[in-house]
């Protein structure tokens, strides 16, 4: 190990306490302090994925943290990605490549040893390149029934000898008890690494909390290094569990934007929804109101319905059919969009000859576009740069993550991009779909599409935008770091 590289581990009392954003904020603060810093998460379970420039698949959360650090995302930052497929099975992505689909017990039998070797190799490579590694744990480090096969928490901290911060979510209630209970369940060597406690999502006056903090420090002997305020704005969620607050947050955006000339876009909340980060740029548009529609709910009368990506296209398509949402879509007269798995659903048929998603066979799609898809074992993971043909010529960049090849009938649909196989539309433009994740990140293309919708409603166009959502994301990451800077004793890391 390189003695020049320092590290900090961030673990939590449970999932969704704010570890991901704290790591992102620390990466940005250290970057601003002139340090070469990289994020790391040994194992992530998420359907929100990103493709690195080399074509490796990692969790989107680690890509976000890499951008916060001012560096390109790399596979070493997330060597193991587990993508749930339902029925207690997950696709195993090791070193950026899908290698297996198995149940939890099978995963630990087949992949625990090679996964730990991949973790150590990834850390060694990062240590050779960076001055700092900010490591994120997963869930809680104190799950005693899982400790012997936990790759992501104190095993990493012990391997690095890394000082560790423990994060608790006070908004849920019981934060002090969560901290004390977590510490009591750790082994002595693990507890000795805990050098700081962070209380996250705090609302109210610090002085009202201070007696509890004093007690906590006295009882545990560990300093409270941060009391982070609740942030009333949206950054990307790590996984679909974080979307449960989504409808409320999206409705709040609507209240702030007002009901003026505001396009309403409904996104179908598929059971295995994937890459919902695709919609962050639309969420940032003040003239757009997004809302989730769960299978079984009424579609309403939105201007646009989007079928997002799915880890299990056939299962999610069946959910639409069983709950009546497919019938609602057939009666719907507005615009329909499909992204990745959603694109596949818009076609005539989806064939699964190898039974990748269950029983082998050919299944009917929704029938909105003359497309036929064949699911294939080989996964496509690559970044893309191309030019759009519709709704106007514009440079476009994004990335593909899919298992399947789609063929289009040129008599019934038109290509959207210069590069073949990325997306198609019907002759009217009312229905379209694309394999391209990150499509809405392209400012110019997104505004062309939104303005076409506005034109059809007789509304004035929005100003054209050049550039990419990455610029707004940079501003959000700066805001995150500056919002937490005065509430976090991060400068002790530099001592």
Curated annotation (Swiss-Prot):
InterPro entries per the UniProt record, alphabetical: Class_I_gatase-like (IPR029062), CobQ/CobB/MinD/ParA_Nub-bd_dom (IPR002586), CobQ_GATase1 (IPR033949), CobQ_N (IPR047045), CobQ_synth (IPR004459), GATase_3 (IPR011698), P-loop_NTPase (IPR027417)
Gene Ontology process terms (BP): cobalamin biosynthetic process
Source taxon at top rank: Bacteria
Occurrences of domain GATase cobBQ-type (ranges): 262-445
Residues of the active site: 340, 437
Gene Ontology MF, one: ABC-type vitamin B12 transporter activity
PROSITE patterns (alphabetical): GATASE_COBBQ (PS51274)
Keyword Disulfide bond: no
Keyword entries, A-Z: Cobalamin biosynthesis, Glutamine amidotransferase
Gene3D superfamilies per record: 3.40.50.880, P-loop containing nucleotide triphosphate hydrolases
Entry annotated with the keyword ATP-binding: no
Pathway: Cofactor biosynthesis; adenosylcobalamin biosynthesis
NCBIfam families to which the protein is assigned, alphabetical: cobQ, PRK00784.1
Function as written in the Swiss-Prot or TrEMBL entry: Catalyzes amidations at positions B, D, E, and G on adenosylcobyrinic A,C-diamide. NH(2) groups are provided by glutamine, and one molecule of ATP is hydrogenolyzed for each amidation.
Family classification: Belongs to the CobB/CobQ family. CobQ subfamily.
UniProt protein name: Cobyric acid synthase
Organism, scientific name: Synechococcus sp. (strain JA-3-3Ab) (Cyanobacteria bacterium Yellowstone A-Prime)
Gene name for this UniProt entry: cobQ
